[in-house]
Amino acid sequence: MRRLFAVLLAALMLCGSALAEGMIPFDDYVKALSDFTDELWSQDGAELLWVLEPEEGVTISVCLEDGRVAALTAEFPCGDAPDAVWMALDALGVLDGEALEQIAEMAEDSETELDGSRVLRLHGGQRDAFCVCAAEDAGNMLWQPIHGGSKLHDKPACSGMDAARMITEETAEALGWEDCEKCRASGKSGA
């Protein structure tokens, strides 16, 4: 019985340390995508926010925390997601093949939890996006308009944003943007 307890305790400790690590380190993510694209990553307004445009019309935004991917937004023209989006999601290493198939079937403007990750599918007038973060971090994420606008939001559909990017509160502070008067007036944050 003691041996079984010790084995279970060790397994729980390993799982706990794996969860504490969060998603993939950014350097590993960049390497995972380097076989797919020669395009270079660029910073976008803050040192914790990086952007890649692997093909025309597709933007991959990565928000970092402690050198790891904290949130990913893959934005593309409305309709079926191009291969570059699927490569970006797969390279995270947190979603298995079955989860990626479920994401492909997600309804517009919906969210789900898969493999310990919170996944959202956003639909705008001209742009769609998939957003991914660790499930336990989803309530701490904010939303930033990608095309125009300069306010931070609690909701991805607030103020008619065509495409919203998921970011951490730390990145939001670094950007220095003002809070939206509609959805952040209460001071409550969340995805």
Can you name each region flagged by the protein language model?
Residues 45-79, 111-138:
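Amphipathic N-proximal alpha-helical interface segments
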